[in-house]
Amino acid sequence: MRFSSIFRNTPIQFSNRRSSVKLLHSLPRLKPTNSKRFSQKPKLVKTQTLPDPSVYTRDIVSNIYNILKYSNWDSAQEQLPHLGVRWDSHIINRVLKAHPPMQKAWLFFNWAAQIKGFKHDHFTYTTMLDIFGEAGRIQSMYSVFHLMKEKGVLIDTVTYTSLIHWVSSSGDVDGAMRLWEEMRDNGCEPTVVSYTAYMKMLFADGRVEEATEVYKEMLRSRVSPNCHTYTVLMEYLVATGKCEEALDIFFKMQEIGVQPDKAACNILIAKALKFGETSFMTRVLVYMKENGVVLRYPIFVEALETLKAAGESDDLLREVNSHISVESLCSSDIDETPTAEVNDTKNSDDSRVISSVLLMKQNLVAVDILLNQMRDRNIKLDSFVVSAIIETNCDRCRTEGASLAFDYSLEMGIHLKKSAYLALIGNFLRSNELPKVIEVVKEMVKAQHSLGCYQGAMLIHRLGFGRRPRLAADVFDLLPDDQKGVAAYTALMDVYISAGSPEKAMKILREMREREIMPSLGTYDVLLSGLEKTSDFQKEVALLRKEKKSLVASARFRENVHVEDKICDLLFATNLL
């Protein structure tokens, strides 16, 4: 059958009748006049303190999200009750939709359930379902679903649609179909989103007849298809070689007021390219040109290559996508000889192109593609450009893009700006890619950038906190001798104490004294906190206590204190006032 024939055009009627009661109350009435003689002055009501209007919900949600993401749960559990937040379904749901780490999201969900006067509703439950479903934790998702049933929480079409989507995405089409039937049996009427998701699942599983029946049922239920519904139909038709029928739907949907959007056009052209349907692609490109719709960069590149292979003109494609002409020119005009000599003018031009794409268009996917091409062709970019790429990728938490740019700088022998190295270190620490931190520090030292006393000590401490004492020692060894002060030595001692190796900490102390570096208050606190727990260093503990007492009594550490001693004390002293 032809899908384009299944259309309806039912006029919508509006009633203009007014209720007689409303007409009666709409007649003009005289207002009683109050006598000034007996009128009473309004009582003064004590004004309530209004909340600070500058504190927006998005700021509250962002604060809670940062606590969940960057703190361990014990710390987060202590901070959350003291935020002064009125915990309601809206706030809880917004926090969950911000996608904190899955485990933290579940702990936060359970923590919120214990708040006095708060109960989870179907909004928060459905969001928690989505989090587990997106992570592929289908059994956990089902557990939350059963919990909803036990608690008597309303289960609506939105909840069922989410379940059907994630269950089908996991490959269990039969399970998704059972959920569909359960939804219908429970009286939940499907929406256009439900119908569309279910049809897409059936088409993908090759159940064309069932998908067709669902579409007919959708029309009989007077649910109007939207752009995504038509896109699902056209995507299936193009994949089966029925491009004329797909075009028929493409134009008829416009006649009834549904305009194909950017997502629809990109999906259709990607599908047409996959099956070599260039004529269909041309018809869609004409519509895109008339309506100002553009392609995503990867699809544009694929379309460019397909038209070139077919010997067809790409003028229309370039005209529609003039916004990415910089990328296309760069990808086509680069010398294809890998060992070609690159002069200063060419290098400057390529740097300008990359800067334009990154800083003006913020198209980081395109930048990744260009970097790979330039690495293959041995083209060297300016240091400030590669540094900007790394910093922008780190700002957006794109670890892959930042790693790609860093690897490119290594191969090309490019020394980066200090801010780029620090951004990389922070990014790799957050993503727990600790061995890469050492690579960055090595390159930073080669580029003659200094970590500094504070950052060096903090990095050593952070690697020790991640239970990687070997990496912490590597960072210490990479530091120049003039940066191996009391803060760095104390940080390394703290690493070994935490790792259960007090003998190594004492060895570091002896090495520090040999270099005539005097311990600070923080050094004594670190050593005593670890050595007091073992009976192997009783003599050393007694001596360290005596030295610490002498240091405190002399008050030398409070008056003319060296900056390194002050940093060490701020980082490691336990009761510094």
Swiss-Prot record:
Annotated NCBIfam families: PPR
Keyword Phosphoprotein belongs to the record: no
Gene3D superfamilies listed in its UniProt record: Tetratricopeptide repeat domain
Similarity comment: Belongs to the PPR family. P subfamily.
Record-level Gene Ontology MF annotations: mRNA binding
Keyword Nucleotide-binding belongs to the record: no
PPR repeats: 121-155, 156-190, 191-225, 226-260, 261-295, 382-416, 417-451, 452-482, 485-519, 520-554
Organism: Arabidopsis thaliana (Mouse-ear cress)
Protein name: Pentatricopeptide repeat-containing protein At2g01390
UniProt KW keywords: Repeat
Upper lineage: Eukaryota, Viridiplantae, Streptophyta, Embryophyta, Tracheophyta
InterPro entries with a match to the protein in the record: Pentatricopeptide_rpt, TPR-like_helical_dom_sf
